[in-house]
Regions:
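PLP-dependent aminotransferase class I/II
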Residues: 67, 213-297
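PLP-dependent aminotransferase-like
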Residues: 102-160
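Active-site pre-lysine segment of PLP-dependent enzymes
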Residues: 141-154, 166-226
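Phosphate-binding glycine-rich loop
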Residues: 64, 69-109, 127
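N-terminal "arm"/small-domain region of PLP-dependent enzymes with the aminotransferase-like
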Residues: 1-62, 153-154
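PLP-dependent enzyme catalytic core of the Aspartate aminotransferase-like
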Residues: 317, 321-325, 330, 334-366
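Conserved PLP-binding catalytic core of the aspartate aminotransferase-like
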Residues: 279, 291-325, 341, 345
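Short acidic capping loops at alpha-helix termini that bridge into adjacent secondary structure
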Residues: 82-86, 106-109, 186, 193, ...
Length: 366
């Protein structure tokens, strides 16, 4: 006799959205020289956050505050909202899972872009949703195509990231606001803003929590350098934010992450420094791409997506050549986006390793 999995879970493949660098290092038997594939901040958290987390480590015998009271209050003050409009969770990925669970049942339709952030799709599949995708247009998620699919399919959810991962592209605030205004009230817009701190100031529409069908997601993993702490938050109309309490794991955000995020949020100087260093790293990555005859795409994130000039098979050979030389990078998973590789912002030393490895990877790719 075997355990009886649910009818939703039984047919799912035993895969994960991302193969981590640690898994690749174990397979290779050697550590990477440059870790430039996960869009982490190699510049690290605020020293004040590190100090706060170090002090909090001695108190980890206590459970976290399940209401995330202090962090929600600080975020509310930072954003000009009420703490009742904020949901804190163990990273955006978990919040996506809660969102799918909250709004969809097996067989319900969800709309996204083909090649967009795969973890959202992972949750849709895990809860039995029916995913309908539309193509990118000129390497950007296309609001018009998404909206057309919404009107045709009447989905429970529609996913849109601004800025976008994996392409680094973005839309100005007025275009995003137009999408918000056009989505019917019985469809929830899942607006992923994980990279918003890196984007031009006119990228994010104003925070309006009056619409119950718009949920915005932000994180401490990227600009704040706390990816390993697993902490992020959602911004929503009050009744929707409260609904998350029905299903979320109330002790899921660890105590050390809560304290670290609170200290990180308060250190504006460190955030400004990180944004400057990321902008400089993007320029360096772009220059390296140009020097090798490749095309760096415009980016409003902490990575640069580089068009390799041919098809996905060629880009995969370039990727493999970089990995063979100890440079961890990634690439989009579907055509035509997979003609590219994606390189995260790194230190000067990291990017020097990348610059040294790229010519050989291109030569070996043929």
């Amino acid at each position: 006799m075997q355990p009886r999995y649910t009818s939703v879970v039984a047919p799912l493949p035993s895969t994960v959205p991302f193969v981590g660098p640690e898994t690749q290092e174990r397979a290779r038997g050697v550590a990477f020289k440059a870790r430039l594939g996960a869009n982490e901040s190699v510049f690290g958290p605020s020293p004040k956050a590190i100090a706060a987390m170090r002090q909090a480590a001695a108190e980890c015998w206590m459970y976290c505050d399940p209401e995330n009271y202090d962090l929600k209050a600080a975020l509310a003050q930072e954003l000009g909202l009420s703490s009742t409009n904020i949901v804190v969770g163990e990273g955006i990925d978990a919040l996506f899972g809660y969102t799918v669970r909250l709004f969809t049942e097996p067989g319900d339709t969800v709309v996204s872009s083909l090649g967009a952030y795969p973890t959202f799709n992972f949750h849709v599949a895990g809860y039995g949703g029916r995913l309908v995708t539309v193509p990118y247009v000129s390497d950007r998620e296309d609001p018009a195509s998404l909206l057309a699919a919404v009107r045709r399919e009447r989905p429970k959810l529609v996913f849109f990231a601004n800025p976008d991962n994996p392409m680094g592209s973005w839309w100005p605030a007025d275009a995003v606001q137009a999408l918000i205004d056009a989505v019917p009230m019985d469809t929830v817009l899942v607006l992923d803003e994980a990279y918003i701190e890196f984007a031009p100031p006119e990228t994010a529409p104003r925070l309006d929590v009056s619409r119950p069908n718009v949920v915005r997601y932000r994180t401490f993993s990227k600009a704040y350098g706390m990816a390993g702490a697993r902490i992020g938050y959602a911004i929503a109309e009050e009744s929707v934010a409260k609904a998350f309490d029905k299903i979320r794991n109330h002790f899921s955000v660890n105590r050390i992450a809560q304290v670290g995020a609170l200290a990180a949020l308060a250190d504006r100087a460190h955030l400004a420094s990180v944004l400057e260093r990321v902008a400089s790293a993007r320029e360096t990555i772009g220059a390296t791409a140009h020097a090798n005859g490749l095309v760096p795409l415009p980016s409003a994130t902490n990575f640069v997506t580089i068009a390799c000039g041919r098809d996905g098979a060629y880009a995969k050979r370039v990727l493999d050549g970089l990995i063979a030389q100890g440079v961890f990078v990634r690439m989009p998973g579907v055509a035509p986006l997979n003609r590219c590789i994606r390189v995260s912002a790194g230190t000067a030393a990291d990017l020097a390793v990348f610059a040294e490895a790229l010519p050989r990877a291109l030569a070996d790719a043929g």
